[in-house]
Amino acid sequence: MQARHPVQLVVEDDLHRSRLTVFFRLLLAIPHYIWIALWSVAVFFVSIVQWAYTLAAGHPAPALHRFMCSYIRYATHLEAYLHLVGNPYPGFTGEEGEYPIDLTLPPPGPQKRVVTFFRIFLALPALLLNTVLFGVPGGGFNARANSRGGNASFQGSSSSGLVTAAAFLGWFASLVQGRMPKGLRDAGAYGIGYGAQSLAYLLFVTDRYPYADPTSLLQAVEPPAVHPVHIVGDAGDLRRSRLTVFFRLPLWIPHFVWLVLWSIAALVAVFLQWWVTLFAGRPAAALHRFLSRYVRYALHNAAYLFLTANPFPGFDGAPGRYPLDLVLPEPGRQNRWKTFFRLFLAIPAAILSGALGGSLFAAAFLTWFVALVRGSAPEGLRNLSAYALRYAAQVNAYFYLLTDVYPHSSPLEGAESAPESEPTAEPQYAW
């Protein structure tokens, strides 16, 4: 784990949302569009002056540093409001402590001149990942069953990014419930926090590079309960073979062929399992074992392809044989209504999984270059990839009737609850 990043996200949101302001959120923000556009023009010119000053003095000018901090904090408040991560209407000055989604920013300090000189070029990878997390303008959503390779066999595709997809789904949920689902709020907060770190790096507030690890960015956020589908593995193993990294795609071809063939059989099996679960109220044990192996294999396969793990995976999806493994529940009773409407209920989760897929591709793309140079994967990118794979595995497990617990979209791993002496009601996850 790296040392604490100087730019930290503060989350003091209570999840309550006003239905009226949620419905008209984009219209209510029109004055802010104008203000941030004007402020951004000023920041462009001020950043040039700050670059020259920092290059000459070895540290940023205090007055310009305060100006940049106010701008970054204001942009964070506005993004949180627009993407339903926060509820109150934000102010226009970027004052610290005035909004439930806030930032702690470092005071001006020494910065390396060589890093300052090449800042715009060094920032490009972080800006690429930030763009993918927020999404491409004009992006859309769709969800489909997919029998090809990748991180989820039932997945969505989206050019709209994690933050935008979470806001899109959260908009409907907030109108119905008057509350933002915690998982979606956490996902949006993560993307906004990474964007703030990227902006702070670009505008010379700090020379510490943005850190993509979700756990680091959401330290102040309470983790959800442990989902019955979760990943396990050695968090400290970042070693990557340069040779297999370079030839990762050709090496993956046998797994691609096998995954396609297994996916066809899995679709037939889940069709039969749907009827069994609908009438018996629980899945057939033999089909459950077959589909569990398939879902676990899909995770191993994607972890290898996207450089989240290093060894070449096996072809059988057996538990305990891969560094990044998947814990799956035993067959148990499932709600018949959830079973009957499973395909439709899975669509929101598939949309979000598709949005996370863009981040997974970007993280793998950047990891490929770093791993070739260093022989190891960046911890932050590896943890972001693990988050995307974990959520995709939960979507798969839900679609393939391994559990009727809905996927939880929080980037945080679940927290272990206290031991229970008596069985309790199964936890309900709303995204």
Predicted segments with their positions:
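Membrane-proximal intrinsically disordered regions of secretory-pathway and membrane-system proteins
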Residues: M1-W431
